[in-house]
């Protein structure tokens, strides 16, 4: 995340071209959906907490990055059981699906945030367009970096004791277990609180503007 180019947008915060997503995908592909998703979400969330521009978005960042790492890990675990070209193609697919999920959640959050603070629908949509381009660049870079790295690292780590803690062992295939249910509830709660915060902020701004006008 610290290797980045910030791009100002007409309304709202800024958008960035960076390499952070590649590490989030790599975490999912190496460690599986649970551990990889948490590593992705916690790492990205901590970055936002230490950046004044993004500190308010940190909880939502955790949720969206967790989703990216979780999906990449879920599909990647099945892919690494295969061999040859089939494995490579499925690992690429895992990375692409993880990135698409994140892009959707990120753009949705950006649009909803602008709407909640009183931005007109068309203006909010126009403000999101530059983020689509930046997100696409980030996604392509993330897949290009994380896929070969994950394959190479798994091969190297297979010769070490560390390999035993990766996602190669048999795991509980019932994904609707207490952990995933709790994380889902947490993500929904964070999203609701974030929306309520923005709504309250917009109300305060509207009241202040009314006082100024009168």
Which residues fall in each region the model found?
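Loop-helix junctions at membrane interfaces
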Residues: 1-214
């Amino acid at each position: 995340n610290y290797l980045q180019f910030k791009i100002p947008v007409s309304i709202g915060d800024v958008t960035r071209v960076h390499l952070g997503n590649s590490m989030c995908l790599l975490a999912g592909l190496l460690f599986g959906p649970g551990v990889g998703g948490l590593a992705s979400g916690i790492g990205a969330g901590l970055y936002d907490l230490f950046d004044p521009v993004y500190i308010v978005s940190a909880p939502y960042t955790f949720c969206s990055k967790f989703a990216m790492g979780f999906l990449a890990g879920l599909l990647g675990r099945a892919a690494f059981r295969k061999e040859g070209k089939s494995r490579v193609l499925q690992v690429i697919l895992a990375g692409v699906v993880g990135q698409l999920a994140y892009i959707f959640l990120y753009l949705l959050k950006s649009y909803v945030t602008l709407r909640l603070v009183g931005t007109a629908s068309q203006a909010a949509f126009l403000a999101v367009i530059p983020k689509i381009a930046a997100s696409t660049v980030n996604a392509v870079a993330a897949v290009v970096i994380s896929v070969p790295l994950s394959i190479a690292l798994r091969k190297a780590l297979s010769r070490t004791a560390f390999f035993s803690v990766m996602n190669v062992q048999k795991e509980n295939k019932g994904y609707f277990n207490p952990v995933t249910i709790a994380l889902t509830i947490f993500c929904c709660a964070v999203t609701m609180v974030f929306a309520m915060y923005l709504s309250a902020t917009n109300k305060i701004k509207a009241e202040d503007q009314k006082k100024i006008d009168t």
